[in-house]
Amino acid sequence: MPGSQRTIVVIHPGGLGDVLLSIDAMAVMRSAFPQHKMILLAGSEVGHLLGQCGVIDQSLPIESSRLSALFSGRAQRSDLQQDLLWRCDLVVGWLSDHDGLIRRTLQEFGIPRVILQSPASTEGPHQSERFLQTLQGEFPGDARAPLRLHLPQQVLQSGTDALRVIGIEQGAPLIVCHLGSGSRHKCVRADTWGTLIQGCRARQLMPVVVLGSADEQAEMAIRGQGLPELPILRPRSVTMLAAILAQAQGYIGHDSGVTHLAALLGVPTVAMFGPTDEQRWAPRGVHVAVVRGENCMCANWDAVRACTEKSCLKVKPNEVFEALDAIDFRYHRVTNS
């Protein structure tokens, strides 16, 4: 891109799911500034993915020490890449700035428009709308059109290759199962997963488990279920994870960033919820269904942590398969029961 191109900068320090929930808002900004280069300051993994999908033009890892001065209010022009702030017309940041220090620092660079807002809120029916509220009245755009992530062909091929390495070719419909979440208090029991995996096989589906670096406990628990020849993949990056998910004809998971990723890729998705509010946090789309146990009666997250019953997570496996079968896939049905 030309060195003189004007830029807009988006700052999002949240995790995978939080960043993915904000891409509708990014699309509104893109529509309002079609000639600008969009730069995202976020986690390196999700930033790389969104760059591959064309949601943004460039990403910079928010973990970088080079950017720490910006958030501490000590940034100097020599500390940041020239094209990050020198030709910037807009900064939108989803972060807290209680003392106004970050705003003042950005304005000292001569940026004409700075919009900063914490994503935390109890208002609004869905978290994606919280990000859109940041832009309310600022830019025109259709905030209701659901987005999909589209991976380039070489990335898709890497997912096919990863499955082939563990002996999975195109054949039975592939169901990706993600056993983890950002909190163990949002995960169903291992024996529920055991029943789900056995149920996939009984329905002539091919279950594949994907695990992240924080899912060691989930891995030990599922291995204790005595499931023979269970395919397990540990993608080395979020982009590789997306490449694998994109091969699937169905996905089962918890309230997690991976579940949002599957849904954004257009994969028929069943999300198992418990203590969190699906009206606020579930992925959206006709290809998404939510199942849960009983309504959670815990008053706050401390009560959730202390709860041993977790009746809200007592999901019935047959309801998962009914949901998977009932989803309007738009491509094809994955169950034959």
Residue positions per predicted region:
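Catalytic machinery of carbohydrate-active enzymes
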Residues: 1-337
